[in-house]
Amino acid sequence: MPIRLAPIAVAAALVTPMALATPAAANSTTLKAVVFEDVKPLYQKTDTGYEGFGVDVLEQIRMQSGRRKVEYSSVDSVNEGLNAVITGKVDIACGVAFTWERSTKVNYTLPFGIGGTRLLMASDTTVDGTPDSLSGKTVGVVKDSPASKVLKNVAPEVNLKPYNTPAEALAAYNSGDVPILGGGTLWLAANSSKETSALLPFRPYGRSGIGCIVNLNNGKLLSKANIAIGQMMQAYMDGDAGTRHMVERWIGPESNVGLTRVGIESLYSLILNVTAEISTPAAPAAR
């Protein structure tokens, strides 16, 4: 099955104003996507719209599903975004961490990343990342986020300071309002500094897949999205230069996330090994 990869130039997708009150039509030429959280490396607001790993994944899904464009909307909370998918007001959301509770309300695609809850703090910290070391410490979190729930479960004695949005939580950490920031691995890594930050623990609390979600009744889009994500991972495994550039610019060795090529290959190999390989005409990249 041939793979169709979006040029990097289109990764900064244009935003078209969208009213969430309009149901997403199954036969629409527009793929309606909702952005839960404007956070690196999945989404970054630009002058013309959004760019990020989530945007690039949505471009692959757009092409596989035969849509002409992706139309983005933003929401004020994760719950509002979930509700938009559940009610069919939008088609899809990408970059969403898997939880068993959510899986009863929406369908998840194959994951294209792995996340988990970690802590961002100054490099000279005395906290070692164990639950005991967090006792009595104040940690900033996004209100009602999976990370806030995980931290409360693994470290009941921690003092969580909730913020309404990731931007507010990050600003509080950067200003020194909170000494520790708790959240998803990719988000924290993308906003960390190798010289001044520590990201703990080494193995995240509560690891989970990161994928896309669609309405429970939209099996056709779910299938197309899985094919698109599977093709992307297989093309990366096959050494396709364009795919490797697309993925690695956001989460690879030269990004703030800093995953190695071997690490990304291992993840994608694991996912494909429990599903199926997809044949792709890869254009080899230099190792």
Model-based region annotation:
Residues S28-F53:
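Short glycine-rich His-centered loop
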Residues E59, M63, E71-S133, T196-Y205, ...:
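Acidic, polar ligand-binding/catalytic clefts
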Residues V34-V39, S73-V78, I86-W100, S123, ...:
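Beta->alpha turn/N-cap motifs
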